[in-house]
Regions:
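Short acidic, gly/pro-rich beta-turn/loop elements at beta-sheet edges
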Residues: 309, 452, 462
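Pre-P-loop entry segment of helicase/translocase ATPase cores
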Residues: 2-71
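Short, surface-exposed linear segments at secondary-structure transitions and domain or protein termini
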Residues: 459-469
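Short secondary-structure boundary/capping segments
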Residues: 122-125, 146-151, 385-389, 413-418, ...
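P-loop NTPase motor domains
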Residues: 53-54, 58-64, 68-367, 382, ...
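Conserved ATP-driven motor cores of ASCE-family P-loop NTPases powering translocation/secretion/packaging/pilus
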Residues: 359-445
Length: 509
């Protein structure tokens, strides 16, 4: 077969006393390291006891057998392909199908809702619990209040854990895109946000606290840019609130104005769109069951603007922290069902704080990451020196195409050379992988790199699929929490509504 002739396996530098030439790859050797979805899991585990599930990323497609071979280990994967390289058709969509066959959970970032439209109905029919956060059209799908988890922890007395979540929120919203020229303003705004969230928690008697409450506090605390001394005298009794806010409260006027300006600019996203503000005021989404029942969460975002990308990064971080917390408190310290982060356009998302540590620790908790990037430069711009740590934690690399010269040279060097010093695959050849055939260069674990055809989604669903209609987001009535009694009660508006319904029933009973 043509594929067999083009596989490149033996890099320059071998210590073996044989000719150091590129040799054609043996497909059977590669297949032995991967998993055939047609095999039983018990048979698979006889060969590799570490494999707990047979779901994974497709790394080889044998068209003659109509068989897809996947990496079912706990390895993370990096997929590189510029716009129009068929990343979605060749990798994302087939990956979701492979994971669904193995009944694994997924969290999927989805520009344009293209992935949702193609797979959500299939997942629903397969018994998946499908939920959607729709930042493209916030009137559809679920609601998500980023402050819900830390407020719940705060109310239940788990203050230290609540502070960790608040700190993550402040860092992701204020410091995800540092100026790198003078980071003082971002860090000061982060301290301000931390203090205001904590103050909102301390003062509130509502069941939920949202960013709307935080923005109202900011307006009250700094009327006309000047601190409200009366509010400050009460707030500073809490030592943590005091330390968080004092840098802004006691700053010189010009400095305070700049801090507030930075804060307002970063928080503008929570104020200018009514549907989004309402979506973030309440919480109808839960990730707690992801590791215990097969679930899929779609994060739909606009691809034409990056306005809401910080919220996607925040959700990814908060969801991960919540899952780690749940895993640590479980008997096995891991999840029964594997959880897969499928992060399309990962390199365009704002920096996720501590991501290198996240991807390092994830495997032991049965969590995998699949990172889709358009270019290496984008990744380096976001994560700087930590980009290399992220790349090195991905055992699988799939290269589709690129015009980024430094990346092409790097990929060519990784593939190795012949004894004469010629690259096994040149920069020129890397730019001419056959798009229509779905050709890709694959680096997988300690296997020699090889070129293969990837399975197109049309080979799996034959381009026939239903579109699952998204439900309209429903407003949840605000409830009050009495901190003295620990009882949650309904708001006055809900009391009135119930009284009207009772009178109506009396009249027509």
């Amino acid at each position: 077969m043509e594929i067999e002739k083009r596989m490149v396996l033996k890099p320059h530098g071998s210590m073996l006393a044989i000719q150091n030439d590129a040799i054609p790859g043996n497909r059977s050797t590669i297949k032995d390291t991967l998993v055939n979805l047609k095999d039983n899991l018990s048979d698979i585990r006889k060969k590799n006891p570490l494999i707990k599930s047979k779901g994974g990323i497709p790394l080889l497609y044998d068209k003659s057998e109509h068989t897809v071979y996947v990496d079912a280990t706990d390895s993370h994967s990096l997929i590189i392909g510029s716009t129009g390289s068929k990343k979605t058709r060749l990798v994302v969509l087939p990956l979701i199908h492979m994971l669904s066959y193995a009944e694994e959970s997924m969290i999927i970032s989805d520009p344009k809702a293209e992935i949702y439209n193609r797979t959500a109905a299939m997942l629903k029919q397969s018994g998946y619990r499908v939920t959607v956060l729709n930042f493209r059209n916030p009137s559809l799908g679920e609601s998500w209040n980023p402050l819900a988890i830390p407020y719940e922890l705060y109310k239940s007395g788990k203050r230290d854990r609540a502070y960790e979540f608040i700190n993550d929120i402040a860092a992701n919203l204020m410091c995800s895109e540092l100026s790198h020229q003078d980071v003082f303003w971002e860090y000061s705004a982060s301290d301000l946000l931390f203090g205001l969230i904590l103050l909102a928690f301390k003062q509130s008697k509502k069941e939920q606290v949202s960013f709307e409450d935080v923005l109202n506090l900011r307006a009250d605390m700094f009327q006309d840019g000047n601190p409200n001394i009366c509010m400050w005298e009460k707030a500073k009794r809490d030592i943590l609130i005091h330390h968080s806010l004092i840098g802004t409260i006691e700053a010189p006027n010009n400095t305070r104005t700049s801090i507030l300006s930075t804060f307002d600019q970063k928080m503008r996203i929570f104020a200018f769109q009514e549907n989004l503000t309402d979506m973030l005021k309440q919480n109808t989404i839960s990730v707690d069951r992801l590791g215990f029942e097969k679930s899929a969460v779609f994060l739909i975002m606009p691809d034409e603007k990056t306005t809401y990308h910080r919220l996607i990064s925040l959700f990814v971080k908060q969801c991960y922290e919540r899952l780690i917390y749940l895993a640590q408190n479980s008997e096995q310290a891991t999840f029964r069902i594997r959880i897969n982060y499928i992060l399309d356009e990962f390199s365009t998302l704002p920096t996720i704080s501590d991501f290198p540590a996240m991807i390092t620790a994830a495997r032991s908790r049965n969590i995998r990451f699949f990172l889709f990037v358009q270019s290496q430069k984008q990744l380096e711009k976001r994560y700087q020196v930590e980009a290399e740590t992220i790349e090195s934690n991905c055992n699988n690399w799939i290269f589709l195409t690129s015009r980024e010269l430094s990346l092409l040279k790097s990929i060519s060097a990784l593939a190795g050379q012949t004894a004469e010093g010629k690259p096994l695959i040149s920069v020129f050849a890397l730019q001419h992988l056959d798009k229509e055939k779905g050709e890709a260069l694959v680096f997988s674990g300690r296997q020699f790199p090889y070129i293969t055809d990837l399975v197109d989604i049309s080979e799996i669903d034959h381009d026939r699929y239903e579109i699952l209609e998204m439900s309209k987001r429903t407003k949840v009535q605000e409830k009050m929490f009495d901190r003295d009694t620990g009882v949650t009660g309904v708001s006055e508006e809900e009391d009135i509504q119930k009284e009207i319904e009772r009178k109506f029933d009396e009249l027509f009973d």
